[in-house]
UniProtKB/Swiss-Prot annotation:
GO cellular component: cell junction; centriolar satellite; centrosome; ciliary basal body; cytosol; nucleoplasm
Subcellular location: Cytoplasm, Cytoskeleton, Microtubule organizing center, Centrosome
Record organism: Mus musculus
Biased composition (Basic and acidic residues): 71-80
GO biological process annotation, one example: centrosome cycle
NAD recorded as keyword: no
Composition skew (Polar residues), residue ranges: 231-241, 540-569
Keyword list, A-Z: Cytoplasm, Cytoskeleton, Phosphoprotein, Ubl conjugation
Quaternary data: Interacts with CNTLN; the interaction recruits CEP68 to the centrosome. Interacts with the SCF(FBXW11) complex which contains SKP1, CUL1 and FBXW11; the interaction is probably mediated by FBXW11 and the complex also contains CDK5RAP2 and PCNT. Also interacts with F-box protein BTRC. Interacts with serine/threonine-protein kinase PLK1; the interaction leads to phosphorylation of CEP68 and its subsequent degradation. Interacts with NEK2; the interaction leads to phosphorylation of CEP68.
Region (Disordered): 71-92, 150-207, 222-244, 420-442, 497-571
Protein name, UniProt field: Centrosomal protein of 68 kDa
Keyword Ubl conjugation belongs to the record: yes
Phosphoserine PTM positions: 315, 453, 459
Length: 733
């Protein structure tokens, strides 16, 4: 660090004009290996370090001689030397030195306003760094937290440590001043006592400004004589402006050093213990080495190591400098944390209330479950970009994506930028069933080269949720999965298709049993035309690759154990139709053509619902009929009986349709059970036979295992109740 002009003159005056004191001279002030123009190094506040051959009795003389020799007037020209007699030894306290100095000054009657004030000003210049040099960064990293916090916060302040390069130049036997070294407050108090003793002619001595005696609290570096003198937090005299600025710097640096320098020892667990966890030790060591800034303490989550709130920051790197950095220009003005810079925002986790900073970050493009959620293009257009990027890139991208999205039907509504329907689309399925029929088959035209490439869609942007091609493919996959499969209808089944099998919308479609084609001949039927079953005939036959409708075999259920086949095409086309209407109380169709629409499961479900309703009504009607009294001979009794008859007759007529529906469905189900009884009987017989065959196979496998054991052991093991050929040789013997 370069010395200022006053400090250079002070060093020259020390080396040339200091009177010798015993064996001490100015040349011996400098440690070995240092040039005369280098600054002196202090071990304690205000105390210089010198070589071992320096006289211990001249310690205070050195300190005070620098004060007087730093002034423009040489001490040798005075009629009376400022200090007479032998100097005190090193064991004498600093307060006694100052008191003796005050008594000698009182004897000499030196005018304080003319002599001491310039000397103290130069002394403050030498020992205390100026305001302009307070922000130097060379010595800032080597300061102790006690230098920043001041003596008022640490009453027992020991000698300040020197930087490593300074300690190497200090002789091992060099004496040092006491830990209670000269502070600005002690200097001010002793000088004020001297003023009271000296009389009113020295009234100007008390007007020494506090910035010249107290250390600015923002001082970080030392020029010339050593570390700065730390004063109390309260100024001696008026100087509130400089002190207020110093307080702001003090709180700032105190927060910095509170994190940078830990107060405890590093963690050292017992590695020979059974409870020692190396991962836990590593985490504790990381927490100790890189502490977090003091802030609201959040509960530690044992399962997740990700912070849920961006409240705690690291020990701070960019916070030291007050200059404008590239990271500070990208800071969002609406961030919750004042330290949350733009470089830290993308690395923050996403959870619950954890998006406090990310919600305000204009580049937040996230992938939701229901569709692609994109932030508004107005925010994206106002995002600060590095110099050299084109402002029209976002507008070109918006126009390109909007144009291509309108051409593509399946994803045009979900990817329209800036549309207010984006938020509602996130909670709905990507393709509602009401819109599936209106979607055109030529939707895969989205894969044409009309889509802009990744290079065209802003390759300069860094935080995109998904690439364009991946989003495009996912949209096509969802479209192809929701696309219904169109089939050709059987002859005469165009009207039957509208009221096909239906189950609840939340459940899969019910399986359809084509019992007429499985067991019965194609010519048998109950009531309808030839070749048609009135209740169980398929109304939709899927087409094979040759364009011919494939019918199920008559022996599918009877001779094989194949699973019951369903119609996947009818699931997407007919859900919420027949069964919900039947359960709601509507009358079943009575013609043969309408009866052929229902499947077996639907018929069973409808029959059970209607039968339960009919049974409940019959119980109620029976109770009313039993409680009704016989008609009386009076006119009033006859009127009441007639009214009761009308109500009863009306109730019976209303439930006549329910009774007929139950009877009709019951007859159909009974006939179906009778027709399927041989099939069911055959299936049960085969199951029983298969069970016996499985048991015999298990016994045979067990016998083979025993035979293998016999061959390995060299002996014959005879199973129970199973005579073998090995018994005959034993019988002959």
């Amino acid at each position: 660090m370069a010395l200022s002009e006053d400090e250079a003159e002070a060093e020259v005056s020390v080396n040339t004009k200091v009177p010798s004191c015993g064996r001490w001279n100015s040349g011996k002030l400098l440690p070995s290996g240092l040039e005369p123009d280098q600054p002196l190094h202090l071990g304690v506040e205000g105390g210089p370090l010198w070589r071992a051959e320096a006289d211990p009795g001249c310690i205070s003389g050195v300190f005070l001689s620098r004060v007087h020799t730093a002034s423009k007037e040489p001490v040798a020209d005075r009629s009376k030397p400022p200090l007479r007699g032998p100097l005190p030894s090193a064991s004498v306290g600093t307060g006694e030195v100052l008191h003796s100095m005050g008594s000698q000054m009182e004897e000499d009657r030196l005018p304080a306003s003319q002599d001491l004030l310039p000397a103290l000003q130069v002394f403050g210049t030498i020992t205390v760094c100026s305001g302009q040099e307070a922000d130097s960064e060379d010595f800032q990293a080597t300061l102790d937290p006690s230098q920043v916090l001041g003596l008022s916060q640490q009453p027992h302040t020991s000698g300040l440590p020197l930087p490593p390069q300074w300690k190497s130049t200090v002789s091992p036997g060099a004496p040092q001043l006491s830990s209670r070294s000269i502070s600005a407050s002690s200097v001010g108090s002793s000088l004020q006592d001297h003023q009271e003793k000296a009389g009113p002619q020295r009234a100007s001595f008390a007007n020494v400004s506090s910035p010249e005696l107290t250390v600015p609290q923002a001082a970080h570096s030392v020029v010339g004589a050593g570390p700065p003198l730390q004063g109390s937090a309260q100024p001696l005299t008026s100087g509130s402006d400089a002190t207020g600025l110093g307080k702001r710097h003090l709180s700032f640096q105190a927060e910095y050093w509170a994190c940078a320098l830990p107060n405890s020892l590093p963690p050292s667990p017992n590695r020979h213990s059974a409870l020692w966890d190396p991962n836990k030790e590593y985490e504790d060591l990381l927490d100790y080495t890189y502490p977090l800034r003091p802030g609201p303490q959040l509960p530690k989550q044992p399962e997740s190591h990700v912070l849920t709130e961006p409240v705690l920051q690291d020990s701070g790197v960019d916070l030291d400098s007050l200059s404008v950095s590239p990271a500070s220009t990208l800071k969002s003005p609406t961030n919750v944390s004042h330290n949350c810079s733009s470089a830290e925002v993308p690395t923050l986790p996403f959870s619950g209330a954890r998006e406090s900073c990310l919600k305000r970050w204009p580049l937040g493009i996230f992938q939701k479950q229901g569709g692609t959620s994109l932030s508004s293009w107005n925010q994206l257009a106002s995002t600060p970009r590095a110099p050299g990027t084109e402002d029209a890139s976002w507008e070109n991208r918006e126009a390109a994506l909007r144009g291509t999205a309108e051409d593509c039907l399946p994803i045009g509504e979900d990817l329209r930028m800036g549309s207010p329907q984006l938020k509602t689309k996130e909670k709905e399925p990507p393709f509602p069933r009401q819109k599936r029929g209106r979607q055109h088959v030529s939707c895969p035209a989205c894969v044409t080269p009309g889509w802009p490439s990744e290079e065209e869609v802003g390759s300069d942007e860094e935080y995109l949720a998904l690439p364009t091609r991946l989003t495009q493919v996912s949209s096509l996959v969802s479209y192809s999965g929701a696309r219904p499969s169109f089939v050709n209808l059987h002859t005469g089944a165009a009207e039957e298709h509208s009221s096909l099998q239906v189950s609840d919308s939340d459940k899969p479609a019910s399986p359809t049993l084509d019992s007429s084609h499985r067991k019965h001949p194609s010519g048998t039927s109950f009531q309808g035309p030839v070749g048609q079953n009135p209740c169980f005939r398929h109304s939709i036959q899927p087409q094979d690759s040759r364009g011919k409708s494939s019918l199920m075999s008559n022996q599918t259920l009877g001779v094989s154990s194949k699973p019951l086949k369903t119609q996947p095409a009818s699931k997407a086309m007919t859900d919420r139709r027949l069964f919900s209407e039947l359960v709601a109380g509507e009358t079943l169709p009575r013609t043969t053509d309408e009866q052929e629409k229902a499947s077996l499961v639907q018929c069973v479900q409808t029959f059970c619902c209607r039968l339960e309703e009919l049974i409940c009504w019959l119980y109620n009607v029976t109770d009313v009929a039993d409680l009704s009294a016989p008609p009386r001979t009076s006119l009033t009794g006859l009127k009441s009986s007639l009214q009761l008859y009308r109500q009863f007759k009306k109730d019976v007529d209303e439930h006549q349709s329910l009774t007929e529906s139950v009877l009709e469905k019951g007859e159909i189900l009974l006939q179906c059970l009778l027709d399927n009884t041989p099939v069911l009987k055959d299936v049960l017989e085969r199951i029983a036979k298969q069970s016996g065959e499985l048991e015999s196979r298990a016994d045979h496998l067990y016998d083979s295992i025993l035979a293998s054991l016999d061959m390995l052991a060299g002996c014959t093991l005879i199973p129970d109740n199973r005579p073998t050929a090995a018994e005959h040789p034993h019988e002959g013997l």
